[in-house]
């Protein structure tokens, strides 16, 4: 399977191409006198070493590219690897079923829970069907319906954030995009069940916040969380999207910076090369984090949970 190497990974891509070429030759002619296995192993070790070197010093813009990687696991990938008995629930009961938001009831180690997350697509048709992970108001109202259901049936709520932002189309604005987001922010802050949010890719502005008010907020190592995309910021400040790398650094969009600012609680480490390199490994790491978070929150009664969440929200932006 192609790993779809990014621009800054091209030296790794060249090594991997050599490995693939030698492996193919070895399979085609097993009578070769040259021991290709040793050479392939040497190149693989060199590739791992080079990958480790490159990924030890990534900038914010490079991490932003990883957060958008086309092979990066999406919400439904994590649902398959972490949860069982997932039963998807559709529709906002008012207008439509927005495929950019998925959600439903599942089990986490046999415990019933509610799941809500953004969902992007991989192939062209799927990307269009999912609107590139940009929800319309009906998506956020579907999410609200599931939040209220979780509250009613005392189900812990897990949200997975991965969106460039809420859909900015005219129709979405006419149907009340800002109202839908604002209502979710208000209602999530008062849910009487544990709410655990994880940024798994792009955490874009209000579109991310609309399912991001929680008792615990985690970020994967190579995810981003920001009020605007680096390109959008650069276009406003410098009138050119080419300045996106500068904007990414200045905005502090990466997990380590947000942890320093106490805007998130935990950073989930990713496999070498990013989550797409080993989906099972990142899913196992994330599951362990979610279980730890849930175990901690289970020790709080409803009043303690709400008070803690309130103080968390009130401390945002406080110096």
UniProtKB/Swiss-Prot annotation:
Alphabetical list of Pfam families matching this protein = ACCA (PF03255)
Pathway annotation: Lipid metabolism; malonyl-CoA biosynthesis; malonyl-CoA from acetyl-CoA: step 1/1
PROSITE patterns in the cross-refs: COA_CT_CTER (PS50989)
Give its localization: Cytoplasm
**What GO terms are given for molecular function?**
acetyl-CoA carboxylase activity; ATP binding; carboxyl- or carbamoyltransferase activity
Cellular component GO terms held in the UniProt record: acetyl-CoA carboxylase complex
Location of the CoA carboxyltransferase C-terminal domain: 35-296
Query: Its Gene Ontology biological processes?
Result: fatty acid biosynthetic process; malonyl-CoA biosynthetic process
EC numbers for this chain: 2.1.3.15
Primary subcellular site in the record, as a coarse category: cytoplasm
Question: Does the keyword field hold Lipid biosynthesis?
Answer: yes
Q: Give the intrachain disulfide bonds.
A: none
Its UniProt entry gives the catalysed reaction(s) as: N(6)-carboxybiotinyl-L-lysyl-[protein] + acetyl-CoA = N(6)-biotinyl-L-lysyl-[protein] + malonyl-CoA
Functionally, this protein is described as follows:
Component of the acetyl coenzyme A carboxylase (ACC) complex. First, biotin carboxylase catalyzes the carboxylation of biotin on its carrier protein (BCCP) and then the CO(2) group is transferred by the carboxyltransferase to acetyl-CoA to form malonyl-CoA.
Assembly: Acetyl-CoA carboxylase is a heterohexamer composed of biotin carboxyl carrier protein (AccB), biotin carboxylase (AccC) and two subunits each of ACCase subunit alpha (AccA) and ACCase subunit beta (AccD).
Q: What is stated as this protein's family in its record?
A: Belongs to the AccA family.
Q: Which PANTHER family does the record match to this protein? A: ACETYL-COENZYME A CARBOXYLASE CARBOXYL TRANSFERASE SUBUNIT ALPHA (PTHR42853), ACETYL-COENZYME A CARBOXYLASE CARBOXYL TRANSFERASE SUBUNIT ALPHA, CHLOROPLASTIC (PTHR42853:SF3)
The name of this protein is Acetyl-coenzyme A carboxylase carboxyl transferase subunit alpha
Q: Which organism is it from?
A: Sodalis glossinidius (strain morsitans)
């Amino acid at each position: 399977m192609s790993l779809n190497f990014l621009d800054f990974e091209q030296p790794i891509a060249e090594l991997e191409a050599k490995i693939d070429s030698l492996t193919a030759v070895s399979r085609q002619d097993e009578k070769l006198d040259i021991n290709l296995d040793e050479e392939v192993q040497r190149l693989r070790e060199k590739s791992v070493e080079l990958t480790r070197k490159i990924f030890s010093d990534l900038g914010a813009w490079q991490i932003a590219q990883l957060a958008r990687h086309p092979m990066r696991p999406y919400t439904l990938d994590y649902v398959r690897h972490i949860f069982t008995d997932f039963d998807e629930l559709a529709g906002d009961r008012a207008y439509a079923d927005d495929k950019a938001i998925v959600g439903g009831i599942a089990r986490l180690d046999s415990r019933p829970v509610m799941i809500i997350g953004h969902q992007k697509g991989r192939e062209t048709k799927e990307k269009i069907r999912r609107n590139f992970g940009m929800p319309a108001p009906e998506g956020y109202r579907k999410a609200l319906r599931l939040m209220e259901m979780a509250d009613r049936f005392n189900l812990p709520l897990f949200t997975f954030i991965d969106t460039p932002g809420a859909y900015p189309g005219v129709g979405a604005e006419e149907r009340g995009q800002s109202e839908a987001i604002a209502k979710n922010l208000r209602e999530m802050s008062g849910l009487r069940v544990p709410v655990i949010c994880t940024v798994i890719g792009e955490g874009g502005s209000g579109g991310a916040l609309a399912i991001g008010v929680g008792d615990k907020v985690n970020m994967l190592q190579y995810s981003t969380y920001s009020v605007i995309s680096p390109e959008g910021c650069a276009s406003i400040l410098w009138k050119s999207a080419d300045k996106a790398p500068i904007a990414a650094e200045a905005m502090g969009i990466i997990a380590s910076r947000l942890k320093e600012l106490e805007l998130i609680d935990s950073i989930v480490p990713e496999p070498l090369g990013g989550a797409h390199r080993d989906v099972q490994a990142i899913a196992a790491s994330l599951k362990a984090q979610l279980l730890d978070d849930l175990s901690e929150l289970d020790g709080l009664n409803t009043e303690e949970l709400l008070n803690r969440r309130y103080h968390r929200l009130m401390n945002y932006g406080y110096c």
